[in-house]
Amino acid sequence: MSLKGNTTMRFIASLSLLALLAFTAPLPAQPPAQIWVVSWIGSVHGPYPSGNPSAQPDMKLAFPSAEAGARDQSFRMIVKPEIWGREARLRLSNALGTRPVTFDGIYVGMQFGSSAVVSGTSRSVTFDGKRSVTIAPGAAAWSDPVALAFVRNPASTELWGRKLAVSFHVAGESGPMTWHAKALQTSYLTLPGAGSRGHDESESAFPVSTTAWYFLDALDMRAPTSAYAIVAFGDSITDGTNSSLNGDDRWPDVLARRLRAVLGNRVSVVNAGIGGNQVVGPKDYSPLMPYPGGPSAGARLERDVLSLSGVSTVIWLEGINDFSRNGNATVEAVQAAMKEGVERIRARMPGVRVIGATLTPALGATNAAHGFAEQDEKRKALNEFIRASGVFDGVADFDSATRDPATGGLKPEFVHNTTTGGDGDRLHPNRLGYIAMGMAVDLNMMRPLAAKAAP
């Protein structure tokens, strides 16, 4: 065979070997499948100022007219993600508004402190590729995914407890504002007419403080398919009345820290509490007929539970306001509404675990609408239903964790007000009481019942 022939054969053999190696070599590692998981929510009600805020400054300078609402001003909402990812998306809400609201100048970045943003972390947020979005009355809108370049390792313990600053500008007048009154978290805004300031990372750009959240009602993160969310659904005792301002020591916060210590960045516990909320009432709720406790549990179930991403468990603590002089509901009516709510959750979210939480005591409460004997008898009857009816997949026994056997009311050490100091109302536990509640939840009940598929 000629030299040329040998060369040709060697070339063909080399190609064959390369083809074989290409066929047998391992494929490049594919990025792990991910899903959206809700990382934070602020259940909306309103319109402002209807609600039950805690430690809220006088907002008349920022909002001279509740009817006009925000006017050409910017907001910087401070929120604490319960799970981290390299991509996020935001939901802006006009659920309780009466006019279309246009938002622009929307940014998300890492909070530095106060209203300052860590330099260089602000990222512009778009909606359908645009830098502004107009949301109709009664509606909400999800943003496009936004890359959080500053989140290099979502599993890093250095991110635990860190907060995001979500900034946006209201163009023109908003009209009545959708809000969450009892944030127990300081956020910031500009004065009317200040224009779009969301890009400004300095703290001087946002001179007004608030302890409420406006318009922003949900934040999702992209997370591995093994990640999941737990929704704490309830009233002021879930919302955190009497806990400490900026302390993140409501019972869902305590539960979240326990789970994170065991599971790391795989589980999110989000708070869907609204102060004054009821299971049954009010029968009629609208921006024109608001109630400080927001729409009934059934009326807000879609927005605050069923529409959320990656949910595996719902813990439902509610009913004491139904049995107050503001509610006057029967035990049977609350039981029926709870059964219906659980059925809706299971129909829309197959495999989701629904945990019933026993109601904490209110006997002897100083609040005029609470604390009387008939309310306590109804509370005991509902607690027996929660424990024994079989409607729920498990029970979080907050009654046993907080009740003083000697008096039937809250344990004395749980009464002192840890938001503003002074005497508590014997209805809402304080910081220590919420810690006891968060510690009373069996972590084994927090495991998903069913695996979630990637979208």
Model region roles, listed by residue range:
Residues Q278, D284-P290, G294, G298, ...:
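Catalytic His-Asp segment of secreted/periplasmic serine-dependent ester chemistry enzymes
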Residues S2-L3, A29-F233, T238-G247, L263-G264, ...:
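N-terminal secretory targeting modules
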Residues D239, S243, G281-A333:
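Oxyanion-hole/transition-state-stabilizing segment in secreted/luminal serine hydrolases
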Residues D239-G240, G247-G276, V280-P282, M289, ...:
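Phosphate-binding active sites in nucleotide-utilizing proteins
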Residues S14-A22:
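Bacterial N-terminal signal peptides
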Residues S2-I12:
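Positively charged n-region of N-terminal signal peptides that target proteins for export
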Residues A229-G234, T238, V267-G273, S312-E318, ...:
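Structural recognition of the beta-strand scaffold that forms the well-ordered cores
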Residues S74, Y214, P252, P292-L308, ...:
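Alpha-helical scaffolding within the catalytic cores
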